[in-house]
Amino acid sequence: GAIATDIVQSEGGAISLSTLATVNGRHPEGEFSVDKGYACGLLLENGGNLRVLEGHRAEKIILDQEGGLLVNGTTSAVVVDEGGELLVYPGGEASNCEINQGGVFMLAGKASDTLLAGGTMNNLGGEDSDTIVENGSIYRLGTDGLQLYSSGKTQNLSVNVGGRAEVHAGTLENAVIQGGTVILLSPTSADENFVVEEDRAPVELTGSVALLDDASMIIGYGAELQQSTITVQQGGVLILDGSTVKGDGVTFIVGNINLNGGKLWLITDAATHVQLKVKRLRGEGAICLQTSAKEISPDFINVKGEVTGDIHVEITDASRQTLCNALKLQPDEDGIGATLQPA
């Protein structure tokens, strides 16, 4: 590797190297060094980049306009500002990184404790945990816009005010949503627009999900939800979107739903029979069913599974004008379902 000492990097200067190099110097933000596979304090901008080789480490790197960090080893405490890009390849790992407005993080390896404070993160078949999404930032699991990666996984995701998370393919396990939005798309089949790892890219939600005040989760039809427990607090909204299903009947299948003052929306096209299959549905709250069906029958909606609590039902048309709201779910005598009854 190259050897250079006492470098003075002026504002806007570009440095390109790998962790095989031996260099040190200073820039407007402080001092930097690269030695024996360890890099610290670099400022990368204007086309400058650092490649962190397998078995090597980099930390406290700043990525600015057109600066890049390419990681096959490990990295931590990276700050990605506008125009900067962090790429973690399979086998690489990143921790405690901050992605600010205009910054980009592309992950195919592993990441933990990432703060998205205005930037964008795409998980391309990698694994991330304890990611925080807020302040206008966007997190995407399973896509780069051209291909779907069904092997990706995110755990313990937090989506706060102004944050948005999209699950295009892969698994979301455990999430807390407070003031943000999470969208699970319907599973996508291979077509002319997407390349997928298999014939189909599954979308899966598992573990515990909490929707707190002003939080929303929108789930496309066909996503796998049976291993999830979703709790909807006051001010939270869970939307199960079956509007793509044509025909008279729509069946939504979920694991457990706890309504603690929140709302569950069931969106249909023109279905005349709607079934919600759950392991358990309990608590106090409202189910709002949206349909463009011309007639509403007494058996329009039924629930299969354990049902307890005080759950009211409202039926609206496609513009969400109320058709009927004096309804509630009445648990069956056998305790394994519920039907629609006058409130």
Question: Where are the model-predicted features located?
Answer:
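Acidic Ser/Thr/Pro-rich low-complexity disordered segments
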Residues: 21-34, 146-149, 188-200, 244-247, ...
